[in-house]
Amino acid sequence: MKGTVFAVALNHRSQLDAWQEAFSQPPYNAPPKTAVWFIKPRNTVIRHGEPIPYPQGEKVLSGATVALIVGKTASRIRPEAAADYIAGYALANEVSLPEESFYRPAIKAKCRDGFCPLGEMAPLSDVDNLTIITEINGREADHWNTADLQRSAAQLLSALSEFATLNPGDAILLGTPQNRVALRPGDRVRILARGLPALENPVVAEDEFARHQTFTWPLSATGTLFALGLNYADHASELAFTPPKEPLVFIKAPNTFTEHHQTSVRPNNVEYMHYEAELVVVIGKTARKVSEAEAMEYVAGYTVCNDYAIRDYLENYYRPNLRVKSRDGLTPIGPWIVDKEAVSDPHNLTLRTFVNGELRQEGTTADLIFSIPFLISYLSEFMTLQPGDMIATGTPKGLSDVVPGDEVVVEVEGVGRLVNRIVSEESAK
C-alpha cells in the first residue's frame, strides 16, 4: 500500500445505536453530522501473513472490514460517479484498543505498529451487500454485512473527496461494528468475504515481534506529520480549554501539504479560518521506545509549518477533525529543513505570524507544555517513528481570521520564514 489509509468511525448502525444516548451529552452534545474520519499512518500497515504485535497489558480488538482502493485522482466526486474512481477492494483489519470516547483523536488506540493489516486487491461487483467473516484459529468468531453501514463506499469516497484530493493507491476503510473480536498472543486471525482474497495474520507478543522482526514497514512518498493541539497553555486558554494532561496528537494527511510561496484556499461561506505558526521537528532515524534522555539523538532537524484550521467545521468527534485540519493545501511547510546542530536550543525560539505585514501572533517555544524529548518518547512508546516523520509542536495564542488576498508569513527564530497567500475557491479553479 503506497497511499494514505483513511478510515471512518461510527459508520455502522450498531455503533450509532450503542452510542445514541451519549451523543446527546457532553462532550458531544449532538450526534455526528458528517463522517468521522481518522488516518492509519504508515507504521500501522502490514500485509497478509505478517504478524500483528500485541502490546503487553492491553486489550486488542480485531476490526474486520473492507478497504476501498482509489484508482485515479478524485476530487469533489458525486456518489453516483464514485465507481469510476475505484480500482478495487481488499479485506482489512482495523485493529484497535477499546475506545471509551470519540471526542479526541484515538492515536494510542488505533495507530500502533501493525494495527492495519491489508489484503490483496480484487474487483468486486457489490460491496454494499457483502458478508465479512472473522475466524480465530480456524473457527468463526464473528460476521457482519456491509448493508448495515450508515454510509456506503460510494458515499464515503464522495464525502472525503469533498475536502481532500484522493490519489491512486489511497485506501478508505469502510467501518466496523460496535462489537469486535478480542485477540490474544498466539491467535491466527483470518478475515473472509466472497470475491476477495483472504487476509490472515498471526498475533504475537510485542516483545517477541521486536526480537524477530524481519520485514520493513511499507514506505510512503512522505513521512507522517503528527500535530499537537493545545500544546501552549496560553493557546488553550485562548480557546477556553484546560491544558491537556496528555499530548493531544492528530495526524495530517499528505494532501494538505503545500510549499513556501504557494496558496491556500479559504472555502466559500465559512466564518473563521485561522493560521497557526509551529515549529516542526523532523525525525532522522528509526525511533521505538526511546527515553526522554536520548530522544534528541533521533532528531534530524527543524522546519516551519502553518497549520491552518477552518473552525466552522469543528465537531466534537476526533476533534480536531479532518475537515478542519486536512483540507487540500491547508498546511504550508518549509521553506527548508535546518540541521539540528544549527539550533542550539529548540526550547527557546520565538514564533511570529504576520498578516499583510502586521504582527498578529508571537510566542516562544519556552512555553511548550510537552517538550520535544517528551513528545518523541511519548509517541515512540506505542508506535515506530521513521526517518522523515515530523512532529508539529503546536501554536501559541494570537489567532485571527484570514481572508482571500491576505499574505500570511509565519516564522520561527533560527529556522525560517514561510510565506503563503489566501485565495478564494473561485480564483483557485
Model feature map: region roles:
Residues F38, A67-K72, S158, G169, ...:
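Short, conserved beta-strand element in jelly-roll/cupin
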Residues M1-K72, A198-A277, N420:
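Extended, compositionally biased flexible segments
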Residues Q15-D17, H48, I77-P79, E100, ...:
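Short helix/loop capping segments that flank catalytic or ligand/cofactor-binding pockets
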Residues A74-I77, L124-D128, A287-S291, A342-S344:
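Short helix-loop capping/hinge motifs at secondary-structure junctions, enriched
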Residues T65-I69, I133, E278-V282, T303, ...:
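Residues embedded in well-ordered beta-strands
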Residues S75-Y89, R288-Y302:
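N-terminal accessory regions of nucleic-acid-interacting proteins
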Residues Q15, S96-S220, N231, H235, ...:
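Catalytic-pocket segment enriched in acidic/His residues
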